[in-house]
């Protein structure tokens, strides 16, 4: 292999040992802190808070299915990520396609607009806008029962 010489602004440099292609660098995922350490960062001055994950039990027509769901992930999204098929349509809490009934535990579904306060007190939940606030059990596929 013959070495080549390049002149750059009057300086001479040998390229015999220079790699022909630039080295590849692996980019770290942006959520590496959360994934490895159970932490999430806040946009305000680098504060870090602990992230909780709860056990969500879904009672589906196929039977009970359990998954871990972080407190900042919608239950529908966590279920899909775990390979559990749940009904949905709008993904915004403005319809009843993903309706379920909480039989134990609690959720935060402040992002939704379809359910009224009485329905929420009765245990109705829209999984597309519900975050777990503790371990929770939800009966899914309840749209027909809700709208009856």
Swiss-Prot record:
<dbReference type="InterPro" id="IPR006058">
    <property type="entry name" value="2Fe2S_fd_BS"/>
</dbReference>
<dbReference type="GO" id="GO:0022900">
    <property type="term" value="P:electron transport chain"/>
</dbReference>
<keyword id="KW-0411">Iron-sulfur</keyword>
<dbReference type="InterPro" id="IPR036010">
    <property type="entry name" value="2Fe-2S_ferredoxin-like_sf"/>
</dbReference>
<dbReference type="GO" id="GO:0009570">
    <property type="term" value="C:chloroplast stroma"/>
</dbReference>
<feature type="binding site">
    <location>
        <position position="95"/>
    </location>
    <ligand>
        <name>[2Fe-2S] cluster</name>
    </ligand>
</feature>
<protein>
    <recommendedName>
        <fullName>Ferredoxin-1, chloroplastic</fullName>
    </recommendedName>
</protein>
<keyword id="KW-0001">2Fe-2S</keyword>
<dbReference type="GO" id="GO:0009055">
    <property type="term" value="F:electron transfer activity"/>
</dbReference>
<dbReference type="InterPro" id="IPR010241">
    <property type="entry name" value="Fd_pln"/>
</dbReference>
<keyword id="KW-0479">Metal-binding</keyword>
<keyword id="KW-0934">Plastid</keyword>
<dbReference type="Pfam" id="PF00111">
    <property type="entry name" value="Fer2"/>
</dbReference>
<feature type="binding site">
    <location>
        <position position="90"/>
    </location>
    <ligand>
        <name>[2Fe-2S] cluster</name>
    </ligand>
</feature>
<comment type="similarity">
    <text>Belongs to the 2Fe2S plant-type ferredoxin family.</text>
</comment>
<keyword id="KW-0249">Electron transport</keyword>
<feature type="binding site">
    <location>
        <position position="128"/>
    </location>
    <ligand>
        <name>[2Fe-2S] cluster</name>
    </ligand>
</feature>
<dbReference type="GO" id="GO:0051537">
    <property type="term" value="F:2 iron, 2 sulfur cluster binding"/>
</dbReference>
<feature type="binding site">
    <location>
        <position position="98"/>
    </location>
    <ligand>
        <name>[2Fe-2S] cluster</name>
    </ligand>
</feature>
<keyword id="KW-0150">Chloroplast</keyword>
<keyword id="KW-0408">Iron</keyword>
<keyword id="KW-0813">Transport</keyword>
<dbReference type="InterPro" id="IPR001041">
    <property type="entry name" value="2Fe-2S_ferredoxin-type"/>
</dbReference>
<comment type="function">
    <text>Ferredoxins are iron-sulfur proteins that transfer electrons in a wide variety of metabolic reactions.</text>
</comment>
<feature type="transit peptide" description="Chloroplast">
    <location>
        <begin position="1"/>
        <end position="51"/>
    </location>
</feature>
<keyword id="KW-0809">Transit peptide</keyword>
<dbReference type="GO" id="GO:0046872">
    <property type="term" value="F:metal ion binding"/>
</dbReference>
<dbReference type="InterPro" id="IPR012675">
    <property type="entry name" value="Beta-grasp_dom_sf"/>
</dbReference>
<feature type="domain" description="2Fe-2S ferredoxin-type">
    <location>
        <begin position="54"/>
        <end position="144"/>
    </location>
</feature>
């Amino acid at each position: 292999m013959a070495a080549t010489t390049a002149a750059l602004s009057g300086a001479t440099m040998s390229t015999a040992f220079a790699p022909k292609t630039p080295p590849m660098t692996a980019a770290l995922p942006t959520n590496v802190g959360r994934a490895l350490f159970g932490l999430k960062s806040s946009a305000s001055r680098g504060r870090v808070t602990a992230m909780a994950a709860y056990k969500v039990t879904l009672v589906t027509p196929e039977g009970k299915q359990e998954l871990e769901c972080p407190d900042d992930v919608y239950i529908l999204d966590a279920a899909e990520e775990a390979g559990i098929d749940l009904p949905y349509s709008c993904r915004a809490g403005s319809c009843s396609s993903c309706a379920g009934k909480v039989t134990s535990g609690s959720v935060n579904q402040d992002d939704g607009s379809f359910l009224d306060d009485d329905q929420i007190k009765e245990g109705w939940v829209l999984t597309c806008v519900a975050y777990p606030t503790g371990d929770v059990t939800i009966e899914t596929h309840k749209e027909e029962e809700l709208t009856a």
